[in-house]
């Protein structure tokens, strides 16, 4: 009987272990200093929701070409009325593994601090965060297959019948000066912009979501690599955003915040000015439909490792980029919620003064 009980317990423990492996490792053991497969990231997303049900929910807003659900994390305190929101997506280009790593880091940081950090708590009260850790899921999975696919960039949709090539550059497929500059009509090219604007279901899904929420979205952040850049609209050299000067000011402040962490310098400007002209980008589309603050982050490095950024650089890259992103988010928040920001600042100063007075009388 004793042997049977021990056997039963071992069976149960084995099943539990297998279930955890299938569903992803526990949050405490999730390694944010490593790159993760799509299955691991999906399990992590579910875990974030399970562990933080008061502030995290998942939303599926489309499917990839290979019929995978495109899912985001909605983060913030619940509200009976629609809230203003921040969008962040990572992994639109498959080979840029540091981008999904950053989205995960960002989520970890805000969820780990909103209960103790009054600033993040205020953001959660006034804003919702829509965060897609991997937009190009098909391409990302393909980039994990082997060394020959590691540098895959595009989606995985097929080209026309007479071509052996596949994939569209999703960041050339949005309806924003589509097909004008910085693209190719050759499907074998890495910057192939698709048969038509929004030919790709991934781009269409984002477009539909932004359209449905455009009156509430204040800021659009799309995370890429590499180059250490903060890019503002637009990718066309002859078109500037109406609030270009303000975007530059906000971007330069973010670059300053980034440099303060590990000393890394980020250039700020439009894509034609600091990188290359392009069209059909998600950043430009977001600005065109009226989302006032739209930025592309190109994370580390400057070409030493390129897309194969070593894992020992994940943490410092994410730490500095987090400060840059929060610099932008705080600016956007404070501009739209001035009274709230003043109240929090006053409360902070009152608390500091009280502490100073109390300690100044201690002899």
From Swiss-Prot:
Catalytic center residues: 298 (proton donor/acceptor)
A single Gene Ontology CC term: plasma membrane
Cofactor(s) annotated in UniProt: Zn(2+)
Biological process according to GO: proteolysis
SMART domains assigned: Zn_pept
CDD domains reported for this sequence: M14_CPO
Protein name: Carboxypeptidase O
Residues annotated for Zn(2+) binding in this entry: 93, 96, 224
Residue ranges of every copy of the Peptidase M14 domain listed in the record: 34-332
Membrane topology: Lipid-anchor; GPI-anchor
Tissues where the protein occurs: Expressed in intestinal epithelium.
EC number: 3.4.17.-
GO-annotated molecular function: metallocarboxypeptidase activity; zinc ion binding
UniProt keyword terms in alphabetical order: Carboxypeptidase, Cell membrane, Glycoprotein, GPI-anchor, Hydrolase, Lipoprotein, Membrane, Metal-binding, Metalloprotease, Protease, Signal, Zinc
Lipidation (GPI-anchor amidated asparagine): 339
Activity-regulation annotation: Strongly inhibited by potato carboxypeptidase inhibitor, and the chelating agents EDTA and 1,10-phenanthroline. Also inhibited by compounds with multiple carboxylic acid groups such as citrate and succinate, and to a lesser exent the amino acids aspartate and glutamate. Not significantly inhibited by benzylsuccinic acid.
Chief location: membrane
Glycosylation positions in this chain: 69, 147, 162, 238
Modification note: N-glycosylated.
Segments forming a coiled coil: none
UniProt source species: Danio rerio
Main function: Carboxypeptidase which preferentially cleaves C-terminal acidic residues from peptides and proteins. Can also cleave C-terminal hydrophobic amino acids, with a preference for small residues over large residues.
